[in-house]
């Protein structure tokens, strides 16, 4: 088998002598502290650039890894949760490479999971409310709220019965199991459960397995881990009466407890089942911390990893995949406070101050960077293709920008509950009310804007009008084109701003 996973184990007992190693793994075992050079030599002889996973069952042997430190990828070191690092060099090493504490007692199950979780890349997508089919037997009120949700109100019956199904099946591979998450809100007077049918691969109707998941099961992401490949047919069942709002159905390749989308990836959830994804990469553990907010994207997961890693410093990727491709990082007080807390916690992890913080984004990401940048006093905020007036964007979509960004109306309704002029102004003011309370007197702003901007034509002028009278340092550059034009040049300017600030403010030279 080509491209096998390279697994390094350091400990007192060679696991490969006691358990069956999965076929897609090459196993390398070392024990003696005198073999530090041997690990490096084996990597050179077998042309191993890095190990897919490093399993350590004795933390005293961690110094064995110091010689290959430059070859270690964060989040790939796994050690027993029963052990605590006592020596400072070892504790810092584990922190520096984001080592994961796990249960090593069930070795066969751990290796089985790792064999499926250590794949390259990432994958996730969603089925929107537009992909739902309401059961013909339901006689209550039905309201389609665009990409936001499907709203049902009425009597669902005293027994569970199918209420909604999805038009498309999901592929569940035995090599890469999926995990699922359903957005919904409901009255307490009704109850839900999810029924999933595993349809035999190559068949149209042969059932291999049928599973039912209660609301309690759905409080966490459901991992569908089968040792066979099948297609998943999904039905939502309900009983009781009241109002039910069903949002997107998310499915992603699982990494079990080792991360979301990528090793170390995490998801912030609020009580409304809304999600924000985030991923921290430690870089060289030296200032600054760059927080990058993803742009609007239908594919789920993280963007910008390559760009940010090239800077060398620690960074935090934050992405929003609600509705069709994001709702600009706004949400409940609980969700927004969660985003602020995530940024603060990672500054504390690194021992950085607000003056060692940069927030940045492109397009939709500029909203998150400025909105949450207002909660700190960052060294810099970098915005390319800035968007600020979300209500105005939705209003323009009716006549001036039809079929270009129709989801803006769903975003307007999601955040204000309406689509009238008052709602437009309310959403616009939500940004500026917070922005104008912030102290940016010590913050550098880097702006790259489109001269023929068609989404939010006044965003750049509005930002400059506010920032000009303050003591803010401002760098800006205009590019010819509309909002979605010349992305290559915009990204070049985006990265140039980062490099200028890293060199001038932090003494980092590429």
UniProtKB/Swiss-Prot annotation:
GO BP: protein transport
Cystines in this chain: none
InterPro entries on file: AB_hydrolase_fold (IPR029058), Asp2 (IPR022267)
Keywords: Protein transport, Translocation, Transport
Knockout mutant characteristics: Loss of export of cell wall protein GspB, the protein accumulates intracellularly in protoplasts.
Main function: Part of the accessory SecA2/SecY2 system specifically required to export GspB, a serine-rich repeat cell wall protein encoded upstream in the same operon.
Assembly description: Part of the accessory SecA2/SecY2 protein translocation apparatus required to export cell wall protein GspB. Binds the Ser-rich domains (SSR1 and SSR2) of non-glycosylated GspB, binds much less to glycosylated protein.
Family stated for the protein in its record: Belongs to the accessory Sec system protein Asp2 family.
Alphabetized NCBIfam families for the sequence: acc_sec_asp2
Name of this protein: Accessory Sec system protein Asp2
Natural source organism: Streptococcus gordonii
